[in-house]
Amino acid sequence: NGRCKGNVEKIREVSMLGAIIGDIVGSTREWHNIKTEDFEMVPTGSRFTDDTVMTLAVAEWLMTDSKHKPETLVACMQRLGRKYINAGYGSMFRKWLLSEHPQPYNSFGNGSAMRVSPIGLYANSLEEALELARISASVSHNHPEGIKGAQAIAGCVYLKSHAAWSTEHYKINQFVTETIGYNLDSQLEDIRNEYTFDVTCQGSVPIAIMAYLQRYNYPPEKALRLAISMGGDSDTIGCMTAAIAAAEKLNVIGSDFDDEVIKKCRALLPTDLLDINDRFEGFISKPLKQSYYLHGYLYAGEYPGDRKNEVAKRKIEHMVHFGIKHFVDLTVEGELKPYRHLLPKGVTYMRFPIP
């Protein structure tokens, strides 16, 4: 029956990937840690960092390569990374970005986890989220802990956007403790003063997840404030926490943050990065916006509509990925080109001529 469980909500005019909001809010606190949840969200000096650039590189990869090839991801990461080379990368990753033949370097830094959230929004199952997260991490952060950190965040984002509201926090906790193997027993308020800067996955990803879980029944800003208040690698912890907290049903992104916060964050992004953010939102929501939920089934609401078979085939693949398994044409005879031959197995097609 696909993803849709009701009428698709209208996308708000003001939106942004939660990971980017968290990155920007944490950007002024990375080297000037604060240990309080009472702070200005987007003060003067706030900026996007490498977390934002690489998050959008992953989003671009998902939009442009339906085969999800590692070499395509590398190309997306290097293109954006080189354009914004002073965004704040670690020394090893900077070398990787500039290398003519980049190779993974066995890193377990949190760079693999900070960029992965678009995968959780895109994936059609938890298994797909974990596999794509593995691919996305392995091109650079191929240490088992680097892969585990990416899978943890991708899985949490997927579950947050798919589980029922009453059980999402339980399912995320269960997934992280049983599948990933992180210990989530600490109360962050109790360890806040002793927590220090740690850029490893195992030292920062659980903190980010606990910040969400310990504020799950509040607006996402509360979870982000708790995450930033821990100190440490604030922009990346904020990026990961906000990515989870902002994930919503039906893939509407970032709409629970205050409009003014979102507007300030959007104003800090250059046009090309903002374009990727907005295109990705359309990419993950358009198939559902242009479909119909009827008697328990999801029907395509738009003819894939290109005379060129390859273009039509890509559109169909996009729709099917997001759970649309039934296609219906209501058409005057001769008006639309049939496309039954382009549909994969397991998909139904009905064509009703209009007199």
Roles of regions detected by a PLM:
Residues 1-284:
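Structured, active/binding-site neighborhoods that engage oxygen-rich ligands
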Residues 287-288, 294-355:
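Cysteine-based protein phosphatase catalytic domain of the PTP/DSP
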